Curated annotation (Swiss-Prot):
<dbReference type="InterPro" id="IPR033138">
    <property type="entry name" value="Cu_oxidase_CS"/>
</dbReference>
<dbReference type="InterPro" id="IPR011706">
    <property type="entry name" value="Cu-oxidase_C"/>
</dbReference>
<feature type="glycosylation site" description="N-linked (GlcNAc...) asparagine">
    <location>
        <position position="448"/>
    </location>
</feature>
<dbReference type="GO" id="GO:0052716">
    <property type="term" value="F:hydroquinone:oxygen oxidoreductase activity"/>
</dbReference>
<feature type="glycosylation site" description="N-linked (GlcNAc...) asparagine">
    <location>
        <position position="307"/>
    </location>
</feature>
<feature type="glycosylation site" description="N-linked (GlcNAc...) asparagine">
    <location>
        <position position="438"/>
    </location>
</feature>
<dbReference type="GO" id="GO:0048046">
    <property type="term" value="C:apoplast"/>
</dbReference>
<dbReference type="InterPro" id="IPR045087">
    <property type="entry name" value="Cu-oxidase_fam"/>
</dbReference>
<dbReference type="GO" id="GO:0046274">
    <property type="term" value="P:lignin catabolic process"/>
</dbReference>
<feature type="glycosylation site" description="N-linked (GlcNAc...) asparagine">
    <location>
        <position position="208"/>
    </location>
</feature>
<comment type="function">
    <text>Lignin degradation and detoxification of lignin-derived products.</text>
</comment>
<dbReference type="InterPro" id="IPR002355">
    <property type="entry name" value="Cu_oxidase_Cu_BS"/>
</dbReference>
<feature type="glycosylation site" description="N-linked (GlcNAc...) asparagine">
    <location>
        <position position="336"/>
    </location>
</feature>
<feature type="binding site">
    <location>
        <position position="132"/>
    </location>
    <ligand>
        <name>Cu cation 2</name>
    </ligand>
</feature>
<comment type="similarity">
    <text>Belongs to the multicopper oxidase family.</text>
</comment>
<feature type="binding site">
    <location>
        <position position="484"/>
    </location>
    <ligand>
        <name>Cu cation 3</name>
    </ligand>
</feature>
<dbReference type="InterPro" id="IPR008972">
    <property type="entry name" value="Cupredoxin"/>
</dbReference>
Length: 578
């Protein structure tokens, strides 16, 4: 009897260990602890001072530095009046969906005076990601970099840099962004655009009252630098370039790519791009001041984006006297240069080598066709006079397959885990538009959308293909779509309407780029594939915050697999309540 009990105890211990494996750091890995105190801080930009939400009083927020395989533990304490969550953008969160962060999807928000501990392990990723708030528009100031170094002893698959530098793009609003979005939702119109772009929180010399608020990157002649580009802007894709310097792209969304040279990088909100920059020899460098500049790639209608340019300075050591040196500005593409956007995306290829294989699904279990774009919804009958949407009787909205997603008041993951989804969500999100139309042609007469909290349920480890098709209902426009909980492979893209009888034969199943956020081309389509190997509930949404606000979002429910290590971990004891 005693031997039998011991055997059962050992079996129980083995099963428990298997359950905990994703939470345990690998041998030689570390556990890295952080505390994020969310609090208001007075910050002045453009000669305008505003009390903004920050982490630990810093803007941008502190960086997290970790290695592949490490566990990261972050205690977030909310000291502001708004509810808060933090999303670890791009982190796979294998079986740890409770730490993903989107409000009312994987957790209820952290209320004022409360705290929550995010606990996750970095699995199979190295490069640059970032963290940001995931409630309303609070991420306009609550963001910071996540630096993922390779496992100790593993070399980089490109030239070792002398130094690496985060370059975070953001948007500055003189007004409170929460008031801006509240007004837009009340009127049904588009929100006011930002007053400036920022690089590492600073607007730079091209804006009024901002020459002293300029980021300066000091470099040594001849040295190699790794720039970790992060687009944390709310609503704008950006072109970026450094005057008189070539950039070598080596990593996107914490996945290595085949290196290629470019003068300009296109980066959408939610994307990261690591580029190498070799500083020029002394004789060349001393003769000029080099600007680093970014401005929007804008395919929407005029007035819907901030049409300004942000600049920083690349400064050689020893620095020259700026007033006496010629000022070199980079050449940036036209605002709506869709050809450059398509060409840049086509250059991105994964390494697809033995050390970093490209495990793209070659067969598809679950195909989906998602038509994405803007639409309308009628104004309330008694408030027609306040409507400022496409017409005076409609409001702007956005949808996937004509479903504008309604956020629940209970976290979807909690409802799924407890088996109490009734009244929270329905598992009937359409796999394709119920009423197909010429997506990039003449818009249909009826532009109204439906509403609902509808999800797709996937069996564990299903191979999934999603074709994301832009629509011209209210004008063709690029949409950066972000998928939580997974990296996906971008197997194809094109202009016009997707043709299922023609385009799959052109898919790249050898070395497609792997990422977590992809730009759906304006007036075109993009195809992605991934394995549903991460149980939980995973948000998918446009990373233009205004479009997410209007409903361009949905959720995937991935069921548990049969084995212990294929099941969602239990919720932590401090999970916030709604």
């Amino acid at each position: 009897m005693g031997a039998r009990c011991l055997a059962l105890l050992l079996l129980y211990g083995t099963l428990l260990l298997l359950l905990l494996l994703p939470q345990l750091p690998l041998a030689g890995a570390a556990t890295r602890y952080y505390t994020f105190n969310v609090k208001l801080q007075n910050v002045t930009r453009l000669c305008n001072t505003r009390a903004i939400p920050t982490v630990n009083g810093k803007f941008p927020g502190p960086k997290i530095v970790t290695r592949e395989g490490d566990r990261v533990v972050v205690k977030v304490v909310n000291n502001i009046k708004d509810n808060i969550t933090i999303h670890w953008h791009g982190v796979r969160q294998m079986r740890t969906g409770w730490s993903d962060g989107p409000a009312y999807v994987t957790q209820c928000p952290i209320q004022t005076g409360q705290s929550y501990v995010y606990n996750f392990t970095i699995n199979g990723q190295r490069g640059t990601l970032f963290w940001h708030a995931h409630v309303s528009w609070l991420r306009s100031t609550l963001y910071g970099p996540i630096i993922i170094l390779p496992k100790a002893g593993l070399p980089l698959p490109f030239t070792e840099p002398h130094k690496d530098v985060p370059i975070i793009f953001g948007e500055w609003f003189n007004a409170d962004p929460e008031a801006i979005v509240a007004q837009a939702l009340q009127t049904g119109g588009g929100p006011n655009v930002s007053d400036a772009y920022t690089i590492n929180g600073l607007p730079g010399p091209l804006y009024n009252c901002s020459s002293k608020d300029t980021f300066r990157l000091k470099v040594q002649p001849g040295k190699m630098y790794l720039l970790r580009l992060i687009n944390a802007a709310l609503n704008d894709e950006l072109f970026f370039s450094v005057a008189n310097h070539t950039l070598t792209v080596v990593d996107v969304d914490a996945s290595y790519v085949k290196p290629f040279d470019t003068d300009v990088v296109l980066i959408t909100p939610g994307q990261t791009t690591n580029v190498l920059l070799r500083a020029k020899p002394t004789a060349e460098a001393a003769g000029a001041t080099h600007l680093m500049m970014a401005r929007p790639y804008a395919t929407g209608r005029p007035g819907t984006y901030d049409n300004t340019t942000v600049a920083a300075v690349l400064e050689y050591a020893p620095p020259g006297h700026i007033k006496s040196l010629p000022l070199l500005r980079p050449s940036l593409p036209a605002l709506n240069d869709t050809a450059f956007a398509a060409g840049f995306a086509a250059k991105l290829r994964s390494l697809a080598c033995p050390d970093y294989p490209s495990n793209v699904p070659r067969r598809v279990d679950k195909p989906f066709f998602f038509a994405v774009g803007l639409g309308t919804t009628p104004c309330p009958g008694s408030n027609n006079q306040t409507c400022q949407g496409p017409t005076n009787t409609t409001k702007f909205t956005a949808s996937i397959n004509n479903v504008s997603f309604d956020m629940p008041t209970t976290a979807l993951l909690q409802a799924h885990y407890t088996g109490q989804s009734a009244g929270v969500y329905t598992a009937d999100f359409p796999a394709s538009p119920l009423e197909p139309f010429n997506y990039t042609g003449t818009p249909p007469n009826n532009t109204n959308v439906s509403n609902g909290t509808r999800v797709v349920v996937l069996p564990y480890n299903a191979s999934v293909e999603v074709v994301l098709q832009d629509t011209s209902i209210l004008g063709a426009e690029s949409h950066p779509l972000h998928l939580h909980g997974f990296d996906f492979f971008v197997v194809g893209q094109g202009t016009g309407n997707y043709d299922p009888s023609k385009h799959p034969a052109e898919f790249n199943l050898v070395d497609p780029v792997q990422r977590n956020t992809v730009g759906v081309p304006a007036g075109g389509w993009v195809a992605i594939r991934f394995f549903a190997d991460n149980p939980g509930v995973w948000f998918m949404h446009c990373h233009l915050e205004v479009h997410t606000t209007w409903g361009l979002k949905m959720a995937w429910v991935v069921n548990d697999g049969p084995l212990p290590e294929q099941k969602l971990m239990p919720p932590p004891s401090d999970l916030p309540m709604c």
